[in-house]
Structure formats: structure tokens, C-alpha cells
Amino acid sequence: MSKRIAGPEIERLIQLLARVPGLGPRSARRAALHLIKKKEALLVPLGGAMQEAAEKVRICSCCGNVDTSDPCTICTDERRDPTTLIVVEDVSDLWALERAGTMNVRYHVLGGRLSPLDGIGPDDLNIKGLVERVSTGEIKEVILAVNATVEGQTTAHYITDQLSSFDVRVTRLAHGVPVGGELDYLDEGTLAAALRARTTL
């Protein structure tokens, strides 16, 4: 049995930090110590921000994004193209696409991807909400921005089937050579996808 080296409040802080993705027990201890050392500058404001987020952040009932308003800021932005919808697996994917800043459109967050091995089926994802949005007739193109994994591709095929009866163009992100990537370092699947998604110059 390991010895307790700190009070229960500090141990609880470490245990909770260790639950954050990307932080293991050791990283959580380091983060906790850093927060405690910078109590007034970091720990107190962080605690307040987390409390405020817990009280005010909600899931958008339209697209599944997280925001302090429902519908979210993206869904209510009239400058965005309402006829194009990008479908993503998770909010982090939505944020990544927004950082890229290449398209001023609306989104739909699935909340995961189909994975029969993990017991995740269509009813566990926000696919029904997507079909309802497309059924209004306002959306002309659905861009499937799912990950290039077996589960991601399975999800893309399922969604394509679900939307086949609607007058909507379904596309997906091209997969292939990343900017700055060298061919010698790419796997065969990535190279094959890049060749299939080649474009005319």
C-alpha cells in the first residue's frame, strides 16, 4: 500500500486531473503542483472558470456543438452558408475545421462513430438529427469530415445510405499526402487514397 504524501483535497485534485485525456498520474501530479504553486494567478481563476463552464455550457440542440447558448453561435450566424453542412465525429473536429477557416458553413456533430465492437450503433449517434436537418430541403451538400479509420469509413457509408433518398449531394474529405509530407514516409493506405483523390492542375 502506497503512503499518502498529501492531504485528501490535493489527492482528489490529482485524481480528477488524471482523468483528463492526455494526462496520466505523473502528469496530473505535476499539473496539480504547478496549480498549487500559482494559486492566486492560476488555481483560483481556473476553479472559477470551471465552475462557470459547468453552470453555463450546454450542448446545441441543433448541431451538437458546445456553447453557452442554444442554438449555438455557429447555428445562429446568418453569415454562414445554410445550404452546406459539414458532419464531424466530435466537437474537437469542428474546432479544428474552424481554425482552418476555409469554409463559412454550418456543422453537425455525431458524437462519435459507429463501432460494433464497442457496442456503438446508429442510435448512439446523432444521425437521426442529421437526417431530420437534411429532410427540410434547405441543405444541398453534406460534407462527411469523419476520420480515415475503419469505423469512420463505416460511419460515412451508413450516413450516405441514410441520405440517399434526399436531393442532397454527399461528399467527403479527400485523403492523401499532407502538406509538407514526403512520400517515402507515408503508409500505403495514405498513398493509395492520395492517388484516388488526385486533381487536375
Swiss-Prot record:
Annotated Gene Ontology MF terms?
A: DNA binding; zinc ion binding
State its role: May play a role in DNA repair. It seems to be involved in an RecBC-independent recombinational process of DNA repair. It may act with RecF and RecO.
Q: Give the UniProt family note.
A: Belongs to the RecR family.
User: Where is each Toprim domain found?
Assistant: 83-178
Which InterPro entries did the record assign?
A: DNA_Rcmb_RecR, Rcmb_RecR, Rcmb_RecR_Znf, TOPRIM_dom, TOPRIM_RecR
Which UniProt keywords are given for this protein, alphabetically ordered?
DNA damage, DNA recombination, DNA repair, Metal-binding, Zinc, Zinc-finger
Listed name of the protein: Recombination protein RecR
* Zinc finger (C4-type) boundaries: 60-75
UniProt keyword DNA damage present? yes
Q: Which PANTHER family match?
A: RECOMBINATION PROTEIN RECR (PTHR30446:SF0)
- NCBIfam families xref list: recR (TIGR00615)
SUPFAM superfamilies listed in its UniProt record: Recombination protein RecR
One Pfam family, short name: Toprim_4
Q: Which GO terms describe its biological process?
A: DNA recombination; DNA repair
